[in-house]
Design a protein with these regions (language model features):
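Secondary-structure junction/capping motif
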Residues: 3, 35, 95, 114-119
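N-terminal secretory/targeting leader peptides
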Residues: 21-110, 125-318
């Protein structure tokens, strides 16, 4: 009788033991391994793996050589990979709301306090089968980088490389736009296929674009966003302890975003040293340029997402 009770107790223990086993999550990046985004992530992953032994581990599969950048979002949605290091601009084909992340005028830490993060996570759950773990790039404006100067904020006659981030704004300024993956931009500049591109204040040296860039238009606009997103089904399959551990690690990673302020200052000085000249307008024109960027983008977002667009604007704006 005692043997039967022992076997029953052991059988009851098996599911709990199986659930407590260490889980490894597969991660893929839309950005190359030499970018600051992936270098920062590598530090995060090493810390998580050291503290998560026996509980949770991350396995970095690779960047664009492993998967095309614009396919990462769908790979996360469908569970081909567990976590994506990517930007919403690269998976707007899944849901238009992904492009609204560039319009945040509040830091990620404040969005966690005012309900903005919860709104994003709810939308990502519903429309993309994703969990929005953390934003790992912040305080980083976008700019237009050019191979030739402009005297005013009019891009008529220019061919500019874009992602969905800049499409509507650059078109509103008269540009002809060409969408490519980051890895194709250098060749496009070299061959004269494009006259410039949109990119954050940082990162152009990671791709050697500075070699073909002559000007940066001021002021910057929007706020560069790179985030960690996870497949919702995979998230639900973790134990409560594993979800809590991953969430705490992600929030701690996000809390380091202040470091982008100094990094961006250093990158600006580095661009100047490389001979990239800033094109500045008078104060009134600069304000109009900046405001128009947001007006155009929010108009497009609310048209594409009449339910969530206004809610996001309310929580994202100062």
């Amino acid at each position: 009788m005692r043997s039967i009770r022992s076997l029953a107790a052991f059988a009851a223990f098996l599911p709990a033991a199986a659930m407590a086993q260490e889980v490894t999550l597969r991660v893929v990046s839309s950005f190359a391994e030499n970018t600051q985004y992936v270098r920062n992530f590598d530090g995060f992953m090493k810390k998580l793996n050291a503290e998560g032994k026996g509980n949770l581990q991350l396995n970095f599969i690779g960047g664009p050589k492993a998967m095309p950048p614009f396919e990462v979002g769908n790979a996360v949605r469908t569970g081909v990979v567990d976590i994506g290091l990517t930007t919403g601009a690269f998976y707007t084909n899944i849901m238009p709301e992904a492009d609204a992340l560039k319009l945040t005028q509040l830091p990620a830490t404040e969005l966690r306090r005012n309900g903005g993060h919860d709104l994003v996570n709810r939308i990502w759950n519903e429309k993309a089968n994703m969990v929005y773990l953390a934003r790992i790039v912040d305080y980083s404006p976008f700019h237009a980088y050019l191979t030739k100067p402009v005297a005013k904020p009019d891009f008529t006659g220019l061919k500019l490389r874009i992602t969905p981030v800049y499409r509507e704004f650059f078109q509103a300024l008269g540009a002809t736009v060409v969408q490519t993956a980051p890895g194709e931009v250098y060749t496009a500049l070299e061959r004269g296929v494009v006259d410039g591109y949109g990119w954050p204040i940082h990162g152009i040296f990671d791709f050697n674009w500075h070699e073909k860039t002559r000007h940066r238009v001021e002021p910057g606009f929007y706020n560069a966003e790179v985030s960690l997103v996870m497949n919702l089904d995979r998230w639900k399959g973790l134990t409560a302890a594993q979800r809590d551990f991953l969430s705490r690690q992600a929030v701690a990673f996000e809390a380091q975003n202040n470091s982008w302020k100094k990094y961006n200052e250093d990158e600006t000085r580095r661009q100047q040293a490389a001979g990239i000249q800033a094109i500045s307008f008078d104060a009134a024109t600069a304000r109009q340029f900046h405001d128009r960027a947001y007006e155009v983008a929010w108009a497009g977002m609310i048209k594409a997402s009449p339910v969530y667009g206004p809610q996001m604007r309310k929580l994202f704006s100062r």
